[in-house]
């Protein structure tokens, strides 16, 4: 039970850690990264792991079920859980909750809830820079899932990095309104490639997997940038790099500390970026010229030292263009 010290009920029995996602675990990016993070915990700790694929209409009932089944810590993966995470935390003060990518403004966060946010724009800035340097057509694309704070960070970071590399680069960005529509991803990617775009950065879940499939089918000259994890294994000749957001590592760090110390640092948001080694890009000497990788290393240092402030939305992007381009 929650006490003033933040101690939690790990004193008796095998701890039970639950992982709740919206969608499926085999999305080859975001949810799968979270799953890999908790699986690594089982190598180090004796825990019971509960995995739950949920959907909007069943969030509350699923979370009640996990609470009643004795979960010590419940992880909620993705911004769609933002509202329900606060609601259940307030209702069940003895429980521990953690959420990845919550969308909270300056509102207070319950003491038994911790949120993890990411400066994904910093990694996307680097891959945008790469795209602009590597593109042969001078036209690159961005394929997003659902428009909003989380995907916008990827989009505007990517666009800013591309413009930083080449102010004349042409960028075409489009959202498909879903993270689970493979066919929509295929359709938009096909159109982009036919319009002369030769590199697409996706942040569209299964839609992005569809885009990778299209790049692979079209072959040489059709390239893609993966997201969250290294996705090069899906199309080794077409995936130039991936903008990484190590959800699994961040989840693992917090849960390990909780299991080792029996303390829970709730009531706040933890923010990770390039500096913490949680976001970044995948090196690929086969497709990224050595001199470009050297430029990226220098650029990373500038971002970490705040010499370059990477935009994360439309407003900050427009400000960035005035300052740096």
Swiss-Prot record:
Which keywords does this chain's UniProt record carry? Cell inner membrane, Cell membrane, Lipoprotein, Membrane, Palmitate, Signal, Transport
| Localization annotation | Cell inner membrane
Which chain regions cross the lipid bilayer? none
Residues lipid-modified (N-palmitoyl cysteine)? 4
Residues making up the signal peptide according to the UniProt record: 1-3
- Any one Pfam family match given in the protein's UniProt record, by short name: Bmp
Q: Which family does it belong to?
A: Belongs to the BMP lipoprotein family.
Protein's job? Immunogenic protein. May be part of an ABC-type nucleoside uptake system involved in the purine salvage pathway.
Q: What is this protein called?
A: Basic membrane protein A
Origin species: Borreliella afzelii
Gene name, Swiss-Prot/TrEMBL: bmpA
């Amino acid at each position: 039970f929650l006490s003033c010290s933040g101690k939690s009920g790990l004193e008796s029995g095998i701890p039970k850690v639950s992982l709740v996602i919206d969608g499926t675990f085999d999305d080859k990016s975001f949810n799968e990264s979270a799953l890999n993070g908790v699986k690594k915990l089982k190598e180090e700790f004796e825990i019971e792991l509960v995995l739950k694929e949920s959907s909007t209409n069943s969030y509350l009932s699923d979370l009640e079920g996990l609470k009643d089944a004795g979960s010590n810590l419940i992880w909620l993966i993705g911004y769609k859980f933002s509202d329900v995470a606060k609601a259940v935390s307030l209702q069940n003060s003895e429980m521990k909750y953690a959420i990845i990518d919550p969308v909270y403004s300056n509102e207070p966060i319950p003491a038994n809830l911790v949120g993890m946010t990411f400066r994904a724009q910093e990694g996307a800035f680097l891959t945008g820079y790469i795209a602009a340097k590597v593109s042969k057509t001078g036209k690159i694309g961005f394929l997003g899932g659902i428009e909003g704070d989380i995907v916008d960070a990827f989009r505007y970071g990517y666009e800013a990095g591309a413009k930083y590399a080449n102010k004349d680069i042409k960028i075409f960005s489009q959202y498909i309104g879903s993270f689970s529509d493979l066919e929509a991803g295929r359709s938009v990617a096909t159109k982009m490639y036919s319009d002369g775009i030769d590199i697409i950065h996706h942040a569209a879940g299964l839609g992005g997997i569809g885009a990778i499939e299209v790049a692979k089918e079209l072959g040489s000259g059709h390239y893609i940038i993966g997201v969250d994890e290294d996705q090069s294994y899906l199309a080794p000749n077409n995936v130039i790099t991936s903008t990484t957001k190590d959800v699994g590592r961040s989840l693992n760090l917090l849960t390990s500390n909780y299991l080792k110390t029996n303390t829970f640092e709730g009531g706040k948001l933890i923010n990770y970026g390039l500096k913490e080694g949680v976001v970044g890009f995948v090196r690929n000497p086969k497709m990224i010229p050595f001199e470009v990788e050297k430029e990226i290393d220098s650029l990373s240092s500038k971002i970490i030292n705040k010499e370059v402030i990477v935009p994360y939305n439309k407003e900050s992007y427009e400000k960035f263009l005035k300052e740096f381009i």
